């Protein structure tokens, strides 16, 4: 009986939070997410003996044994602004972005697409060691980035290059990082696509899944303590949401009331594992209410829906000091990485459908064409220009040498300890003796 009562109590609490999270604000000028901390109706009790006294939950008693079925709550709806033809569905949800901003969204997405194609092919030619494309997910990157303040701190996973692209991170630095040359801010110590930029408030990417989530919560808590008037946004995939760090991060953010946006890119696959084998519940957004986090599910291929949800979440996270969870539904058109062959676990027809029928770049292009802000001649000219820009940065990066091997020992301690100094001297002796066996001419002197 106690188990049934507890289950009913949790279900009713979650149902109330979920419904509150999904209601769009209807007052003039407001969009996106519902008001936080909905006021509950006070239940009347004839005596104190009837009133629940449990400190861990606030709920009513029931007198019938009833286990809560996992499918008793209908699926969380997907918020969208544009249909697949780029037409605004509900005029009241149109963000009315100026032409210049929409063009920046489009050019950031297409420039990222061009860079992906060139760097993917360069890996296949053996010019770089590894790469991960962003095909199909460009809208989640730039739509969210456009809604943030440039000083908001970003914790990425590994497929958020578009956020940096929107923040005008130079193509030369993208290329330098992938080549690991002397212009790489990380001095060639990281795998390709592990970008980071202090000036653009983008924390360097780390390979282990979900480690960035509790770290981002800590940064958000620090921002709150400092009254910094900024948010932290943390990106991750639906696969990473199954890691223990994700759940710890969600709970910390909720209990410490941190100004953070958890942005989940649900692209259908955790490497080769489809969502049908990852979870049995209603995706990732459904987990938010259980932690007391305001949540919403959006069409990740609709850049305006992503923009609206992120903008409203940011506004309220700063004003109310509370976390928000956005689940952006999208599709990973490319392979997981250059180490993956997705044809082993999904059909070509499936990939072609998303590439041809529901691509975020195509949807935004339809919108631009309908507004008279873009035409086929501009499209051809921009594609040619963007490829030229990427190729120039690519060729420049390829010509630059790798960092000096001595830099392996720097940036660890302010003053190098004796043991590390011995290792540095040992490497120098080894290279002096056997240098002809290494491509030292590729390294900076």
Curated annotation (Swiss-Prot):
It comes from the Eukaryota. The keyword Acetylation applies. Keywords: Acetylation, Magnesium, Metal-binding, Mitochondrion, Oxidoreductase, Phosphoprotein, Potassium, Thiamine pyrophosphate, Transit peptide. GO terms for molecular function: 3-methyl-2-oxobutanoate dehydrogenase (2-methylpropanoyl-transferring) activity; metal ion binding. Together with BCKDHB forms the heterotetrameric E1 subunit of the mitochondrial branched-chain alpha-ketoacid dehydrogenase (BCKD) complex. The BCKD complex catalyzes the multi-step oxidative decarboxylation of alpha-ketoacids derived from the branched-chain amino-acids valine, leucine and isoleucine producing CO2 and acyl-CoA which is subsequently utilized to produce energy. The E1 subunit catalyzes the first step with the decarboxylation of the alpha-ketoacid forming an enzyme-product intermediate. It is found in: Mitochondrion matrix. Thiamine diphosphate binds at residues 158-159, 207, 239-240, 265, 336. Gene3D superfamilies: 3.40.50.970. GO terms for biological process: branched-chain amino acid catabolic process. The modification Phosphoserine is found at residues 337, 339, 347. The modification N6-succinyllysine is found at residues 356, 380. The gene is BCKDHA. Its EC number is 1.2.4.4. K(+) binds at residues 206, 208, 211-212. Residues 33-54 are annotated as: Disordered. Phosphorylated at Ser-337 by BCKDK and dephosphorylated by protein phosphatase PPM1K. This is 2-oxoisovalerate dehydrogenase subunit alpha, mitochondrial.
């Amino acid at each position: 009986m106690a188990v049934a009562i507890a289950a009913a109590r949790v279900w009713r609490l979650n149902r109330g939070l979920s419904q509150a999270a999904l209601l769009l604000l209807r007052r003039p000028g407001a969009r996106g997410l519902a008001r936080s901390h909905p006021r509950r109706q006070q239940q009347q009790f004839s005596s104190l003996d009837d009133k629940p006294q449990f400190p861990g939950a606030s709920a009513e008693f029931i007198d019938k044994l009833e286990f809560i079925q996992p499918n008793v709550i209908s699926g969380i709806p997907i918020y969208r602004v544009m249909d697949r033809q780029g037409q605004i569905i509900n005029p009241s949800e149109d963000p009315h972005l100026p032409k210049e901003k929409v063009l920046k969204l489009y050019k950031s997405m297409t420039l990222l697409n061009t860079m992906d194609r060139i760097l993917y092919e360069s890996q296949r030619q053996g010019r770089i060691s590894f790469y991960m494309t962003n095909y199909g997910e460009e809208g989640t990157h730039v739509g969210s980035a456009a809604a943030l303040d440039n000083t908001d701190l970003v914790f990425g996973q590994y497929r958020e290059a578009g956020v940096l692209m929107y923040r005008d991170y130079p193509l030369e630095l993208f290329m330098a990082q992938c080549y690991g040359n002397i212009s790489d801010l990380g001095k060639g110590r990281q795998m390709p696509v592990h970008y980071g930029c202090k000036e653009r408030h983008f924390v360097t990417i780390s390979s282990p899944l979900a480690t960035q989530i509790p770290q981002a919560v800590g940064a958000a808590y620090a921002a709150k303590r400092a009254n910094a008037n900024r948010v932290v946004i943390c990106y991750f995939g639906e696969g990473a949401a199954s890691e223990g760090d994700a759940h710890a991060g969600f709970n910390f953010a909720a209990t410490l009331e941190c100004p953070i946006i958890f942005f989940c890119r649900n692209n259908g696959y955790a490497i080769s594992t489809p969502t049908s084998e990852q979870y049995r519940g209603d995706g990732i957004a459904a987990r938010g209410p259980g932690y007391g986090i305001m949540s919403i599910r959006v069409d990740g291929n609709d850049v305006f829906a992503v923009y609206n949800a992120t903008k409203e979440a940011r506004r309220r996270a700063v004003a109310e000091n509370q976390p928000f969870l956005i689940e952006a539904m999208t599709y990973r058109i490319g392979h997981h990485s250059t180490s993956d062959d997705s044809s082993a676990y999904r059909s070509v027809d499936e990939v072609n459908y998303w590439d041809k029928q529901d691509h975020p770049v195509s949807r935004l292009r339809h919108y631009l064409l309908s507004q008279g802000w873009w035409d086929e001649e501009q499209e051809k000219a921009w594609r040619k220009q963007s490829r030229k820009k990427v190729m120039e940065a690519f060729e420049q990066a390829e010509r630059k040498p790798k960092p000096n091997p001595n830099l392996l020992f720097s940036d660890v301690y302010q003053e190098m300890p004796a043991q590390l100094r011995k290792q540095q001297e040992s490497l120098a002796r080894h290279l002096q003796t056997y240098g002809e066996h290494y491509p030292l001419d590729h390294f900076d002197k």
